[in-house]
UniProtKB/Swiss-Prot annotation:
Superkingdom of origin organism: Bacteria
Pfam families, per database record: DNA_ligase_A_C, DNA_ligase_A_M, DNA_ligase_A_N
EC numbers on record: 6.5.1.1
The species this protein was found in: Anaeromyxobacter sp. (strain Fw109-5)
Name used for this protein in its record: Probable DNA ligase
Gene Ontology biological process: cell division; DNA biosynthetic process; DNA recombination; DNA repair; DNA replication
Gene: lig
UniProt lineage: Bacteria, Pseudomonadati, Myxococcota, Myxococcia, Myxococcales
Catalytic activity field: ATP + (deoxyribonucleotide)n-3'-hydroxyl + 5'-phospho-(deoxyribonucleotide)m = (deoxyribonucleotide)n+m + AMP + diphosphate
MF terms (GO), sorted A to Z: ATP binding; DNA binding; DNA ligase (ATP) activity; metal ion binding
Amino acid sequence: MQLAELVQTSDVVARTAGRLEKIARLADALRGLAPEERLAGASWLAGELRQGRIGLGPAAVRAALEATAPADAPALAVREVDASLDRLAAARGAGSGRERAALLAALLARASADERDFLARLVLGELRQGALEGVLVEAVARAAAVPAGEVRRAVMMAGALPPVAEAALAEGAAGLSRFRLRLLEPVQPMLAQPAAGVDEALAALGEAALEWKLDGARVQVHKDGGEVRVFSRALRDVTPAVPEVVEAVRRLPASSLVLDGEAIALRGDGAPEPFQVTMRRFGRKLDVAGLREGVPLSVLFFDALHTAGEDLIARPASERHLALAAAVPDALRVPRLVTSDGAAAAAFLEGALARGHEGLLAKSLTAPYEAGRRGASWLKVKRAHTLDLVVLAAEWGSGRREGFLSNLHLGARDPEGGGFVMLGKTFKGMTDAMLAWQTERFRALALGSTDGYVVHLRPELVVEVAFDGLQESSRYPGGLALRFARVKRYREDKRPEEADTIATVRALHARQVAAERGT
């Protein structure tokens, strides 16, 4: 396939509002890919590089564009572009930055104007074309003539869509069947939706399992004989950073385990340290021995995906917890209460808050483990409203904030239309250290110059925002605005694809309106 065909598909999908039309266009493009092009082509349609990040920022890409002129006509094939990107990604050592820049310039010099724009945005991670994962799952299913549910299940197991698309297009249902839980290979974590309170959570779930919501780092721990590996929420292998977790799981008698839980730094009295303290244990360059002494970690588990040779993902939560309790002692399990009684639930919530924890998770007793999904089977209850939003832009500050990029433009994810929907701005809640850190980070994420009052950013950073409510607003395209928003913390453990959706925000607003009316 020629690159120009994928570029045209991307452009049409970006300009198309209807979900079904997007799916049809994407399915046609996927069908047209040759076997050796499928992994790269599916990755590009998902707005990402098969090679991952390749170490070129906006300045380098802009310089490559300025140093070359567009080709008169499109002539690049998908295979040769992918091969060029392989060479870019492989550049290492002294002078590798210059080598990557030269390779990119050589590629752009052979590309037409439309292809250059596509490639530049792809390299920078800015290819927002309205083809988010839900739409692509349906497109892969149509192109491969397999059920969308099977594609979705395979993506949950694989942790990414492109390899699933490649397998489905090559072998159909047989290819998808190979994606299953494997020891020492992480799967996407199951996620929770917000609920206004315990009464709302119990009304939705009936009798439910309530668990303390710990403000720690999500970990997925795999054990296969004597080998233990620990993976972060983003599926990064963090085993060397958390020897306490490894040792705790290695001591468990079961020969094989996959456990979901939280690693958390606790003070001597059992109260949690701030989230930022726990996250110091998960940096890229660590003095593990020193940090272990200064910031010791505890681990508490709340789910079992596999025990003693048996996969449990498809089992009801009640059965998974029985397996967890059989494999893991009380001291390593999150406190839990099964109830349908509102008073008992409220008391359990108060107990969690009194000990310094965030709140509760209310979980359906009958639901399977829906890896990678933020479904209605898990509901999180906190004292204050919070949302995980994406920073779309920032404004230069004044007064105490002069010289810092501070006033954040905040957006919710829009899976249907693609991209993000702005909900408001805030500079509240930021410490001096946070202002300095984010200003440096925003410079690296800037789309174009940072000289103007507003600096637009690549939508890569997720921030947890507390707010007092939502109000209708004609100022923002979603029709809603945050009321008294303030920053709680950056969620470097979350990807933009894991931010809260505009549908979640609208549901919160609907519940708020109903509560105000007494309905």
